[in-house]
A protein has these predicted regions:
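ATP-dependent carboxylate-amine ligase
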Residues: 1-35
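ATP-dependent small-molecule kinase catalytic core of the GHMP/sugar-kinase superfamily
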Residues: 170-179
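Anion-binding (especially nucleotide phosphate/pyrophosphate-binding) glycine-rich loop
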Residues: 38-167, 171
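Thr-Gly-centered strand-to-loop micro-motif
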Residues: 10-11, 136, 174
Length: 179
């Protein structure tokens, strides 16, 4: 007969190790979703990734107002970003991305999930892949992309000049669209 604390886990196709670690984190947390999230995620991140709890967000916006986020992350690379998104999905933690914080108002009550910011050097990389292709990180500033492209003879980036923000933000907000 089952006791109140007994649990049964059925695993189908997929990554058994990931599910086993998630289940173990959940068991250790005694039902605390955020503790389970942290227990699962922390060992999967590189040392240079930032993961903070109850992080004030006002200083991360140009307006300088707003509350805290339950979780805040600055992943060092794409593998860490993938681990963060995976953990959010596994533990039902809502997530949101921010860029440089321009034109962003954070509610005073904050955000109960995880805020991700692509801030480190990995995300700011701009490099040529071929003679007519650039590889650009989502955190690269538009003015720096424009300058880099112009200095190396790339065409078609001129419209970025004068648009504030990063590539990720520009794509999200459809920057430069006319009408």
């Amino acid at each position: 007969s089952r006791k109140a604390k007994d649990q049964v886990l059925f695993v189908g196709a997929g990554d058994l190790e990931r599910w086993a670690h998630a289940f173990a984190a959940w068991e250790k947390s005694d039902g605390d979703k955020h503790l389970a999230f942290s227990t699962y995620l922390t060992p999967r991140l590189s040392a240079s990734t930032i993961l903070l709890a109850d992080e004030p967000l006002a200083s991360k916006t140009t307006i300088g107002v707003g509350g805290s986020s339950k979780w805040y992350a600055e992943p060092a690379n794409s593998e860490d970003l993938r681990s963060i998104v995976e953990a959010c999905n596994l533990f039902g933690v809502q997530r949101s991305m921010i860029g440089r914080g321009s034109n962003l108002i954070i509610p005073d009550e904050g955000f109960g999930g995880l805020v991700i910011r692509l801030k480190g050097p990995y995300w700011k990389e701009i490099s040529p892949r071929t003679e007519d292709t650039l590889v650009v990180g989502a955190g690269a500033k538009l003015k720096e992309i424009c300058r880099f492209a112009c200095e190396r003879g790339f065409k078609g980036f001129e419209f970025l000049e004068g648009i504030p923000g990063t590539l990720g933000g520009a794509l999200r907000m459809n920057a430069g669209a006319m009408g």
